[in-house]
């Protein structure tokens, strides 16, 4: 076999190997056991669940099991708007996480909550009061796309970025700020010279 033939064969084998491992990796994606551990479902952001209890045949039979009222509704919004007229709670864009039998959610005003998925009962809430710091430091105003969940098999943490530039970490079971995470939050503005609160420039 000439040199060109060997090169072509090697290239073909390399391509087949890449396709094989890519297919194998993709097969590992997808949520497991109904859990939704990331914004897109899994680390591959497949947004896919293999659960099949709900299908086109029984979709019309679905009924509302419970409703959940956002904890933002319990805030004195009129009083808050006197200091910050831009506050709003209508931009709800978060995707709830489902981890180890609990739903986790973040509201438009950065309040976090854990919810029993069977009953809709609120298990705990955490209010970092980021809305008291003034307008969000991001240009997208008051909304949040979601949370992150982390576990080492024993400890469980829920993490979220806030409008005023902090990253908070809470115990997923209790909602208590993580003492090993700088008391529960770190300042993301540190080390970024042009990033200052109340200034979008």
Predicted regions and their residues:
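Extracytoplasmic beta-rich repeat domains
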Residues: 68-95, 125-152, 180-201
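Blade/loop signatures of beta-propeller domains
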Residues: 29-69, 73-74
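Repeat-blade elements of multi-bladed beta-propeller folds
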Residues: 36-40, 88-111, 138-166, 199-201
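Boundary at the C-terminal end of the N-terminal hydrophobic targeting segment
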Residues: 25-27
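Bacterial N-terminal signal peptides that target proteins for export
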Residues: 2-13
